[in-house]
């Protein structure tokens, strides 16, 4: 009769070793995926996030469909500056607005019947608006900004819902998500955005 085959201890040890290696591999992948998820959350929450321009209110600087990186870090250490392009939500709404800062906290903003912007009674020298402002909205009368308020406008001045309207009004510092920093799409316009 045939010989009874004894299990090879080397084969048993090899199989057990493969199971341990497989567990280590799975555990390694779980930790890696968890790390990537936490890192992604930290970056989106504290550093920057992607956003898409929806509309024509910032033309000719930004165009409908442009994809941007909104940088959130610098405003943790310094205040927004005049002409920064910021992203903020309207109070109580989930949609985000992208506008340029015109008036800073404590300043008085007014737009005259000729479309000129005045800050504290002095003409603002700027060339972001492509055309003469036709409707000064609530800025036809002087608007004095609070200690934490900003007056914002779209670069497409006659096709922008911004601080001139009652719906948007002055933007509080706490509303500002971050500063539009980098255009990543379309690729032929890839680059840093002009703020100053």
What are the roles of these predicted feature ranges?
Residues 1-96, 171-175, 179-196:
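Protein maturation boundaries and topogenic segments
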Residues 66, 81-85, 107, 149, ...:
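Structural motif
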Residues 61, 79, 102, 110-111, ...:
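Extracellular/periplasmic catalytic domains that process cell-envelope and extracellular macromolecules
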Residues 73, 91, 114, 122, ...:
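Short, surface-exposed secondary-structure boundary micro-motifs
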Residues 119-137:
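PP2C/PPM family metal-dependent serine/threonine protein phosphatase catalytic domain
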Residues 138-178, 183-186:
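Soluble extracytoplasmic domains of inner/organellar membrane proteins
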Residues 96-122:
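Mid-length scaffold segments of soluble, non-membrane domains
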